[in-house]
């Protein structure tokens, strides 16, 4: 039998010991960046309302949000513009955002408080860790990944987020009938996304093999997108269904 605490955490049969936690290898570094005073205050005032502290135990997301609704995850939300826009325009969904860049988290916290949002929760942590240890398989209706770091030098391509193991992890967390939406303004990253996702069991490109879709109305144009367009880059929107 699964035991749930009041904050939606599924209590595991044997939690990690302190020594086990120390031995874990982190695949990321939390990025502090330059905090404005307002962003610092946002963490102090609004993290208890919107933030989720990583504890390494599976969560019941319906308990976490206090309702049963479709769950959307945005990985690497940056300054939070896309996530905030979606929360404003699609209130029937519950949103989970993950970001390692602290000033971006602070900026979004301020925006969510200004909007009076009730259906958004944020992690300031690594997406792989959160997905592996806190999200139940099949719990998500949609995953959104917009303009991940392209690591444009060829020798750095191995650092890109969209790799076979990560794609398999995303498939596990999506329910059948859910979808994965990604956007990039780097042509060779779009090619890599197609290579990886077309070869991942459980995903089917809604636009056909190596196809793309128009920008959906749920995605606002980000500053990264505008910057890319100013540099002459086009944007690829890839939409995959979980089957």
From Swiss-Prot:
Catalytic site: 149
Gene Ontology MF terms in the entry: tRNA (guanine(46)-N7)-methyltransferase activity
Catalytic activity line of the entry: guanosine(46) in tRNA + S-adenosyl-L-methionine = N(7)-methylguanosine(46) in tRNA + S-adenosyl-L-homocysteine
GO cellular component, one term: tRNA methyltransferase complex
Pathway(s) served: tRNA modification; N(7)-methylguanine-tRNA biosynthesis
Alphabetical list of PROSITE patterns matching this protein: SAM_MT_TRMB (PS51625)
A Pfam entry, by short name: Methyltransf_4
Positions annotated to bind substrate: 153, 185, 222-225
Record-listed E.C. numbers: 2.1.1.33
Entry superkingdom: Bacteria
List of residues binding S-adenosyl-L-methionine: 74, 99, 126, 149
Keywords, alphabetical: Methyltransferase, S-adenosyl-L-methionine, Transferase, tRNA processing
Cross-referenced InterPro entries: SAM-dependent_MTases_sf, tRNA_(Gua-N-7)_MeTrfase_Trmb, tRNA_methyltr_TrmB_bact
Class of enzymatic activity (EC top level): transferase
PANTHER family: 3-DEOXY-D-MANNO-OCTULOSONIC-ACID TRANSFERASE/TRNA GUANINE-N 7 - -METHYLTRANSFERASE, PENTACOTRIPEPTIDE-REPEAT REGION OF PRORP DOMAIN-CONTAINING PROTEIN
Family membership noted in the UniProt record: Belongs to the class I-like SAM-binding methyltransferase superfamily. TrmB family.
Database matches in HAMAP family: tRNA_methyltr_TrmB
UniProt function note: Catalyzes the formation of N(7)-methylguanine at position 46 (m7G46) in tRNA.
Protein name: tRNA (guanine-N(7)-)-methyltransferase
Organism listed in the record: Xylella fastidiosa (strain Temecula1 / ATCC 700964)
Annotated gene: trmB
